């Protein structure tokens, strides 16, 4: 399809499309035609747990004050102080409000960070399978995304990372709990990564940043969140309240640096500058004011764990193979046939079951499904998953 007037890059990416968005649109079409209760949509990772009542009360009280003007680009001091306290407690590291930047979601945080550190032609390693937008975020600023496979257990392959590093490497995006697999990286695995990056810096003087993308960090069921700040000294944390507070549509995130980061003040100045010049200006003010009033910045994760447990039991009963998801709200089973796209198309056409092929995440042979859906949908999908697997057994 030729699209007149668009940039070549955008035209090419529009023609490629996104499997997640395609399935989102297909789901809307099927629901309109057959009714919502007849479509089993596991395609989109949308939080299902409502924000805490304390957040809603804080939002109402702040709305009544009617303060909606511009604020400083870095974000409200009270919100940054709350985030610094939150991060310091979680990671047992030294964070301060001066080294926090409030952003438009974690996506905004990553774009601000990448714009600040990546020169055209420099490389950023992404660990496959990966969140599809990573590649586009990197390319937004003339960078090159370098795909490096995780192990078969979806852990960091340290030797593969070593082989992926070149003199042009500027960063590596680290995501745990992991989208799309639901795995949670161990402290040793991240320690080994940190040791590798420190070895390279000591030998060559090369600066490589770890961009720690952790929006699912409050949704961990069977493990503890590893601490990259104890493993490496050049960590840029990018996160959001989308899942922590169940406010994905409100687009409130942040960047955080701990006291060990060299040139932290210079980086923060760059982040604030890019927050403005990329057009974000400042993160949503009402959301910042509400967060600043919160005592606990998390939802109850038990509803997600209940759904996780039910979903994996159904998949096991049907015969699917997968790594147990220990965080987030995704499962990443193996496709029973080599062509996972054909498998997902079959699921949609025969069963009105929407699941995402792994080719949308930079690898083949799997599919992703989200258990952040109504629990009745999971229960009612049991016979469908059993029948779907039998179609290819």
Swiss-Prot record:
This is Putative aspartate aminotransferase YhdR. It comes from the Bacteria. It is found in: Cytoplasm. CDD domains: AAT_like (cd00609). GO terms for cellular component: cytoplasm. Its cofactor is pyridoxal 5'-phosphate. InterPro entries: Aminotransferase_I/II_large, NHTrfase_class1_PyrdxlP-BS, PyrdxlP-dep_Trfase, PyrdxlP-dep_Trfase_major. Its main location: cytoplasm. It catalyses: L-aspartate + 2-oxoglutarate = oxaloacetate + L-glutamate. The modification N6-(pyridoxal phosphate)lysine is found at residue 243. One of its GO terms (biological process) is biosynthetic process. Its EC number is 2.6.1.1.
């Amino acid at each position: 399809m030729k699209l007149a007037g668009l940039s070549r890059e955008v035209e090419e990416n529009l023609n490629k499309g996104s499997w997640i968005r395609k399935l989102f649109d297909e789901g809307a079409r099927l629901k309109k035609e057959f009714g919502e209760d007849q479509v089993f949509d596991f395609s989109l990772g949308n939080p299902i747990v409502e924000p805490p009542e304390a957040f809603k009360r804080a939002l109402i009280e702040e709305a009544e004050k009617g303060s909606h003007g511009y604020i400083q680009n870095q974000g409200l001091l009270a919100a940054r102080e709350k985030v610094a306290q939150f991060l310091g407690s979680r990671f047992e590291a030294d964070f301060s409000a001066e080294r926090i930047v409030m952003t438009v979601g974690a996506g905004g945080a990553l774009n601000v960070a990448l714009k600040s550190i990546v020169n055209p032609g420099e490389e950023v390693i992404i660990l496959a399978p990966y969140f599809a937008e990573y590649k586009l975020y990197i390319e937004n600023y003339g960078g090159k995304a370098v795909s490096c496979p995780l192990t078969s257990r979806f852990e960091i392959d340290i030797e593969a990372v070593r082989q992926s590093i070149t003199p042009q490497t500027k960063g590596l995006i680290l995501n745990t709990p992991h989208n799309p697999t639901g795995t949670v990286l161990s402290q040793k695995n991240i320690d080994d990564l940190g040791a590798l990056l420190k070895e390279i810096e000591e030998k060559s003087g090369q600066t490589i940043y770890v961009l720690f993308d952790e929006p699912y960090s409050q949704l961990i069921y069977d493990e503890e969140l590893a601490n990259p700040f104890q493993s490496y000294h050049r960590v840029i944390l990018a996160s959001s309240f989308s899942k922590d507070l169940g406010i994905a549509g409100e687009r409130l995130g942040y960047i955080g640096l701990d006291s060990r980061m060299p040139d932290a003040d210079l980086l923060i100045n760059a982040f604030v500058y890019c927050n403005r010049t990329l057009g974000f200006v400042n993160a949503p003010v009402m959301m910042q004011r509400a967060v600043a009033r919160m005592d606990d910045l998390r939802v109850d994760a038990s509803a997600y764990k209940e759904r996780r447990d039910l979903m994996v039991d159904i998949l096991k009963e049907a015969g699917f193979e997968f790594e147990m998801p220990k965080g987030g709200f995704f499962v990443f089973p193996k496709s029973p046939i080599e062509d996972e796209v054909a498998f997902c198309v079959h699921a949609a056409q025969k069963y009105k079951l929407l699941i995402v092929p792994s080719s949308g995440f930079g690898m083949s042979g799997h599919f992703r499904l989200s258990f952040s859906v109504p629990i009745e949908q999971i229960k009612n999908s049991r016979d469908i998953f059993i029948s779907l697997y039998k179609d290819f057994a």
